[in-house]
């Protein structure tokens, strides 16, 4: 049974949350990406809340800017330090400051927040699980040096346009459905994208798209252009990139926006790494292979840290 609630944070932001499991139990926190919402985690919330699967307190916030969470209009409000602050505050509330998260689980933009969180606040979580979300070190490397990644990420330069949210909303969100569909022209929509699931997406998108687009506007990690150096002007020290937590990475290899070159050399930044490459899965592996994602996470949670 999923409960929904509005969680005020001490610094004035409110996050709309979905949760399952008893408060006071070890906490799993799940972070979604763009253009999604917390609802994408419902099956995992219910699974891991069950006593036979760990009996966790499972919480999935809608990140700031999404669904009914606070959605500041200014781009600066979506800088990484603010996104990490939201999650650190939510962790303190959900764990009551008594113990670290059992695991922080994240996909896409949620993963970008989670990588930063794990680097800055390793004492607040025991483990990290990432699903098709590039580590900033490998992402920066590929954006600077790999023309294929620059082309794959070209959509980012569309999403930073001032009229991006207006264009995304046109024709019943035609472009957003395209993000979720199979990339081959003329191919049918994926089987997981049912009318019921579409209604869940619309319930998020109908509340506004500016917040989601502001994630892209606030980040320099995008392909360089003649008038905009973007990633080419960024250098990050190793101290900002190293993640010491035991980390699970699950990667659908058919991700057209985030190709598998992004997991090459990942162990240089994440020494305690468990990596699962999944053929025939895309960026939307949570929807395509929920059974596999659940099993990988279950095994990772049960494994002793090493």
What spans do the regions from the language model cover?
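Conserved HGGG/HGGXW glycine-rich cap/lid loop of the alpha/beta-hydrolase fold
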Residues: 20-71
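Structural motif
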Residues: 9-10
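Flexible "cap/lid" subdomain of the alpha/beta-hydrolase fold that forms the substrate-access gate
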Residues: 2-4, 13-15, 27, 40, ...
